[in-house]
Every structure is written in structure tokens, then in C-alpha cells.
Amino acid sequence: MKKNTHLDYKQVLFVDSSTGYKFVCGSTYQSDKTEVFEGQEYPVCYVSVSSSSHPFFTGSKRLVDAEGRVDKFLKRYSNVKPAQPVQVAEEPVAKGKKKPSLKKKK
């Protein structure tokens, strides 16, 4: 078995950036930033949504996402011009000619 393949599992401080709620949970997350929480120093992970801010857990219909997927899409494609419709020339059908039958002849 290879040695040193697994990351270190340690206690990490998670901070909800929208509400400021803090909680400690075991994780393999690695961070250079640290904070003191309840007398101990922990690596910090900032999350945009947690149980204190998610509408399912809070029961409110508050907008959680500050800059979501729709905003990114609109920002990316707001300067794009709509494509011009392609004009297809139709071939005139000669009158009196029948179209070939698709049935097999015996």
C-alpha cells in the first residue's frame, strides 16, 4: 500500500459568509487562514450557504445566491449579437411530374 495518500482529517471552522454563523466540523479541507473559535485555533473555510442561511432550513424565501449562474450567463452573453436566420432557396417543382414511389416493385 502507498503511504501518505490520504489527506489529514482535522477539525475545520466553517463560516457562513451571508449570516456570519460559525461551526466546527471534521474535514480534509486545507486552508492557510486560521481563526480562534471557542478558545482554539482552526483552519477556516468560508461557505456561501449553510443550514443557517438555506431557505429549506430557515423556512424563508430569501434570495441566497449573491451572484448566481443566471447573472454569470447574462454577463457573459450580453454583448453577443443574435445570429442571422439562414435563408434556404427552394427548388421549384415542375408541374405534371409525379414523385417517385417508395413502394418496392414486384
Curated annotation (Swiss-Prot):
Q: Does the keyword Ribosomal protein apply?
A: yes
Region (Disordered): which ranges? 85-106
- GO terms for biological process? translation
GO cellular-component term (any):
ribosome
Q: Does the keyword Chaperone apply?
A: no
Q: Supply the alphabetized keyword list.
A: Ribonucleoprotein, Ribosomal protein
Indicate the segments annotated as coiled coil, or none if absent: none
**Biased segments, Basic residues type:** 95-106
One MF annotation (Gene Ontology) recorded for this entry: structural constituent of ribosome
Q: A single Pfam family, by name? A: Ribosomal_L31
User: Which HAMAP family does the annotation name?
Assistant: Ribosomal_bL31_2 (MF_00502)
Task: Tell me the PANTHER family matching this sequence.
Answer: 50S RIBOSOMAL PROTEIN L31, CHLOROPLASTIC, LARGE RIBOSOMAL SUBUNIT PROTEIN BL31C
Family of this protein: Belongs to the bacterial ribosomal protein bL31 family. Type B subfamily.
Q: How does it assemble?
A: Part of the 50S ribosomal subunit.
Protein name per UniProt: Large ribosomal subunit protein bL31B
The species this protein belongs to is Chlamydia felis (strain Fe/C-56) (Chlamydophila felis)
What taxonomic classification does the UniProt entry list for its organism? Bacteria, Pseudomonadati, Chlamydiota, Chlamydiia, Chlamydiales
Q: Which gene encodes it?
A: rpmE2
